[in-house]
Regions:
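AAA+ ATPase "lid" subdomain C-terminal helix
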Residues: 245-250, 258-272, 311-314, 332-333, ...
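Terminal-proximal interaction/regulatory segments of ATP-powered molecular machines
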Residues: 311-395
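Conserved catalytic segments around the Walker B and adjacent sensor/switch elements
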Residues: 56-58, 81-97
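Short alpha-helical segments that sit at the start of domains
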Residues: 286-318
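Mid-core helix/loop region of P-loop NTP-binding domains shared across ATPases and GTPases
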Residues: 2-16, 54, 97-218, 226-244, ...
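Conserved C-terminal helix/linker of AAA+ ATPases
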Residues: 264-288
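A short, basic N-terminal segment
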Residues: 1-55, 77-80
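Walker A/P-loop nucleotide-binding motif
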Residues: 52-75
């Protein structure tokens, strides 16, 4: 019987040619409406290729305006252009929301060059020295993108940027490490030292939100890659572009498109209609990024599930930390995980708060503000509960 189900699902009529082309990680060959910004970035990096100097650039813009994809696309071209000029340059893209400590960012750089590099138990300074030695010994260059750096600096302070910009300089010789920082806006620069601040300040590429017609072009170019020919109705594209233009967010537009395709497949409709887009809209919330939920660590996921479940069950606006912690223990049991201690649970909550997934404030109850009240403001608790269960099942 299950064999039949398998075959049936495999043979099911689908509107997709390749749905993976709609996933947030996919880097399209062509970036629509970002030629000027790409050119600007190239101009900033010209001296790196011509004079073998180093560069620092900051890319800013709100959610889903193409910061990550611009940097990745640029990095690929930069490597190519350097190679054809006989320059050994590596581009590395690091997401600082995922690699959350200075140590793990630098270890990532080292490991890129040699996965077997012995780095356990060594401090970040030592590791960074190793990177510089490595680059020197091979006459090699490195451009690192520190993506979602604002979030990282808020949590860890300015040391990472400081070390990456200074280590080589302090040792004399050429600085072989260039940086592309990505952040929502420039405000995080204030917590960096004056010298670093000013280099970034002079090299800012600010990406605007996309208009409806720009979003339509982005959608159309992705539809050609991801869908079978002619299955997405033009009205559907217009509607999705309109909906997403309120935020100017291409990620939201592409997610709507993907879910609309899924809705069409669920009905074996063969075409993606505006009604499928409307259905999709009912289950996507641009306020919370899917990747943010997906990239949470296991116990952060369990904690978030506990918050969502508590709020969904109680139907109240707020949940108290003590109650959520009890729910967390139940959730852990359900997923056969050993619950972590109170202090760690506390840290998970703080991190969820920092990511903007939950909102925490003092309850006014208990001693010295020990009790906090937690709310979920951006999405229905019921929706979040289901999402978290889905993600935890995938593990
Ligand atoms: N100009 C574009 N052409 C084609 N696809 C694009 C373009 N801009 C964005 N996208 C796509 O939209 C999605 C979101 O883009 P991206 O991840 O680069 O946004 P972001 O600015 O980094 O957002 P965040 O601040 O949330 O990290 C990705 O799937 C990306 O491929
Ligand atoms: Mg990004």
């Amino acid at each position: 019987m299950y064999g039949d189900i398998f075959e049936e699902e495999m043979n099911r009529e689908t509107v997709f040619r390749d749905a993976s082309k709609l996933m947030p990680e996919y880097v399209p060959q062509v970036l629509v409406h970002r030629e000027e910004e790409f050119r600007q970035l190239t101009r900033f990096f010209k001296p790196v290729l011509e004079n073998r100097s180093s560069q620092r650039v900051l890319i800013t813009g709100s959610v889903g305006v193409g910061k990550t994809v611009l940097a990745r696309r640029f990095g690929a071209e930069l490597e190519k252009a350097a190679g054809s000029r006989g320059m050994n340059l590596t581009y590395l893209h690091i997401n600082c929301r995922k690699d959350r400590t200075i140590y793990s960012v630098i270890a990532k750089i080292l490991q890129h060059f040699n996965p077997r590099w012995p780095y356990y138990g060594l401090g970040p300074e030592k590791l960074l020295n190793d990177v510089v030695n490595y680059l020197n010994s091979r006459d090699a260059y490195l451009t690192v993108t520190l993506d979602e750096l604002d979030f990282f600096v808020q949590q860890n302070g300015p040391n990472l940027v400081y070390s990456l910009t200074r280590t080589a300089e302090e040792r004399g010789g050429p600085n072989r490490i260039s940086l592309i920082a990505i952040a929502r806006d420039k405000s995080f620069l204030r917590s960096l030292d004056a010298a670093t601040q000013s280099t970034f300040m002079h090299n800012v590429i600010a990406l605007d939100r996309y208009s409806a017609s720009q979003l339509k072009d982005i959608l159309l170019s992705r539809i050609r890659e991801a869908f079978k020919h002619g299955v997405v109705e033009e009205d559907t594209v217009d509607l999705i572009a309109d909906i997403a233009s309120r935020w100017g967010d291409a990620r939201f537009a592409l997610e709507l498109l993907w879910r609309a395709g899924m809705a069409a497949d669920a009905e074996a409709a063969g075409v993606v209609t505006p009604e499928h887009a409307r259905k999709a809209k009912a289950e996507v919330y641009p306020e919370i990024k899917r990747e943010v939920l997906r990239d949470l660590q296991l116990h952060e996921k369990l904690t978030l599930l506990a918050v969502a479940r508590k709020l969904n069950l109680s139907k109240r606006a707020y949940a108290f930390t003590g109650d959520v912690e009890k729910t967390y223990r139940v959730v852990c049991e359900e997923y056969r995980e050993e619950p972590r201690r109170h202090t760690q649970f506390w840290e998970y909550l703080q991190r969820l708060n920092a990511l903007g997934v939950v909102d925490i404030k003092p309850s006014g109850l208990g001693q010295r503000g020990q009790t906090l009240k937690i709310s979920i403001q951006e999405v229905p608790a019921e929706w979040l509960e289901k999402e978290m269960e889905k993600l935890l099942r995938e593990k």
